[in-house]
């Protein structure tokens, strides 16, 4: 019965079903639809922008094999728990980061210091469609190179969340973050010190910023939230 509906109606139904704004585990809900029948598969894969299709990658899957199966859709790279494998987990993240022109979302939390430093080393290139970056190291990593990290420019980034990531050159990078709405930096230390003057200067470019959190290791914090 449902296949009697016009394609435009089916597309509206699919759009409601695959809406990725609800939960990250719904990012690949569209995969269920494409396996129902050829008609549904064609409708879904012919409408990647309308349905906001994305491929979800995480450290626990063979990334290269997965990316070879599907069309070149935007990549959602995420891991929200400590289920990291010592070797192939980082290798899978690195394989996903090779697709820097396709990555739209990165969320890697509770990552060991050694693994995080390997990941940061693989991010010294441009990520032109990246809108969200969440990086949480279990302990402090080496300082990030401000000139090469993310290619030195983040024009599409909307959310930036860093924990235990020293980044003294962050203000230089933020100058390009004209779409940033949410900036949260936790466990800031002396090695990642950013002068108040430098931060204030870069804030003039962040005209869309709504949420700002700066939390220091000394338990002193400065937080501003606007709605």
Language model feature labels by segment:
Residues 94, 120-121, 147-148, 170-174, ...:
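The feature encodes a structural signal of leucine-rich repeats
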Residues 6, 18, 123-124, 138:
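Residues that cap or delimit alpha-helices
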Residues 55-57, 77-84, 107-113, 134-141, ...:
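Concave beta-strand-loop units of leucine-rich repeat
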Residues 39-52, 68-76, 98-105, 124-132, ...:
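Leucine-rich repeat
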Residues 2-118, 156, 169-170:
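Hydrophobic regular-secondary-structure patch
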Residues 181, 185-204, 208, 215-217:
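Internal alpha-helical scaffold/solenoid segments in large eukaryotic proteins
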Residues 3-17, 128-133, 203-214:
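Conserved long hydrophobic alpha-helices within structured protein cores
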Residues 219-221, 225-227:
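Acidic, glycine-rich loop-and-beta core segments that form the ion-binding/anion-interacting portion
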């Amino acid at each position: 019965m449902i296949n009697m509906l016009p394609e435009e109606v089916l597309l509206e139904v699919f759009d409601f079903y695959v809406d990725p704004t609800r939960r990250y585990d719904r990012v690949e809900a569209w995969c269920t639809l494409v396996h129902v029948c050829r008609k549904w598969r064609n409708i879904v894969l012919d409408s990647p922008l309308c349905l906001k299709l994305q491929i979800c990658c995480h450290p626990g899957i063979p990334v290269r094999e997965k990316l070879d199966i599907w069309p070149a859709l935007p990549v959602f790279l995420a891991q929200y728990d400590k289920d990291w494998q010592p070797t192939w987990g980082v290798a899978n993240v690195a394989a996903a980061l090779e697709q820097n022109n396709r990555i739209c979302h990165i969320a890697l939390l509770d990552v060991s210091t050694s693994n995080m430093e390997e990941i940061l080393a693989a991010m010294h290139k441009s990520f032109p469609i990246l809108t969200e970056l969440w990086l949480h190291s279990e302990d402090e990593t080496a300082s990030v190179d401000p000139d090469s990290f993310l290619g030195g420019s983040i024009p599409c980034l909307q959310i930036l969340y860093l924990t235990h990531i020293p980044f003294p050159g962050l203000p230089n990078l933020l100058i390009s973050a004209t779409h940033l709405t949410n900036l949260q930096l936790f466990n800031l230390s002396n090695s990642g010190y950013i002068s108040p003057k430098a931060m204030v200067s870069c804030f003039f470019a962040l005209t869309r910023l709504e949420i700002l959190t700066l939390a220091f290791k000394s338990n002193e914090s400065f937080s501003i939230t606007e709605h």
